[in-house]
């Protein structure tokens, strides 16, 4: 799951990449955050260094947003990475066909979480976090850092809790 300051890689910053991974019988998370705008490429490098041990990527709408955004940033920084060696599962793409059957207003991750009764601890939207990140870069604070990490952690946790919906997929 990525957090960015906008929807277009050309004019926005990728400031946080969060991953869940399964090891020794349980789920763990890792979060890679750019503490300044200049560290963006370092976060991407650290992500690919971490991901090279894995072959599968599970994401929520990553085919349409996360993966293209990261690849555009790789181009921008002339980084030699791609997702060609990975197999992926886009939870959004797999669940969206059931939107009307489930009587959902949309297939946003937070909507699916509410449908499943999953509680989030974070109170900010991704859009609200943009300002919090810009404030954090100028004047780092524990509040801002915690808000940024918590939102991403809840997104990751939510994806893991949405995964069982795929057991009904044909």
Language-model segments: residues:
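Metal-dependent phosphoesterase core characteristic of DEDDh/y 3'-5' exonuclease domains
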Residues: 12-15, 24, 28, 62-162
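Conserved RNase H-like, two-metal-ion catalytic cores of nucleic-acid enzymes
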Residues: 1-53
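Acidic catalytic cores of enzymes that act on phosphate-bearing nucleotides/polynucleotides
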Residues: 160, 164-170
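Secondary-structure boundary motif
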Residues: 49-53, 76-79, 168
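Short His-Asn-centered micro-motif
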Residues: 2, 59-62
């Amino acid at each position: 799951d990525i957090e960015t300051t906008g929807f277009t890689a050309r004019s926005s910053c990728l400031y946080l990449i969060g991953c869940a991974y399964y090891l020794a019988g349980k789920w763990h998370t890792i979060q890679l955050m750019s503490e300044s705008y200049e560290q963006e490429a370092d976060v991407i490098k650290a992500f690919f260094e971490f991901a090279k041990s894995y072959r599968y990527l599970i994401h929520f709408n990553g085919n349409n947003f996360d993966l293209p955004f990261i690849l555009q940033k790789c181009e921008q920084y002339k980084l030699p990475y791609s997702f060609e060696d990975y197999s992926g599962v886009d939870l959004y793409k797999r669940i969206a066909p059931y939107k009307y059957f489930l009587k959902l207003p949309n297939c946003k991750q937070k909507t699916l979480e509410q449908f499943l009764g999953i509680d989030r601890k974070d109170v900010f939207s991704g859009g609200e976090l943009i300002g919090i990140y810009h404030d954090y870069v100028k004047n780092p604070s524990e509040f801002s850092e915690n808000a940024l990490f918590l939102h991403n952690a809840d997104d990751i946790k939510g994806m893991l809790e949405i995964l069982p919906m795929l057991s009904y997929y044909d």
